[in-house]
Amino acid sequence: MPKGYLVANLRVKDPEAFKKFSEAALPSIEQYGGRILARGPHADRHEGNVSGVVTMLEFESKEAAEKFYFSDEYQAAKAIRDTGCDADLMIIEGIQE
């Protein structure tokens, strides 16, 4: 089964809220079997308008990533995130190997 990936671009408006979001989100990422593949504000942009903190999470499947995203635990963290960040977020299915 192909892996699932959550890719987010977060434009931080309130660093303290972003810190609280990060602390709240990590346990739910782990609880739903996710792992952080990449995260950081220092992405080299070569095309488009991406700016901010880019994060990529890996899950066992696209369905597992969606289960994480819609979980009560993550939605509570997201409520914190929404107070201090603008976000673009997508969940995609990996390639079957």
State each model region's role.
Residues 1-53, 60-70, 93-97:
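Short S/T/G/P-rich N-terminal loop/turn motif that feeds into the first structured element of a domain
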Residues 62, 66-90:
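C-terminal structural segments of small proteins and small subunits
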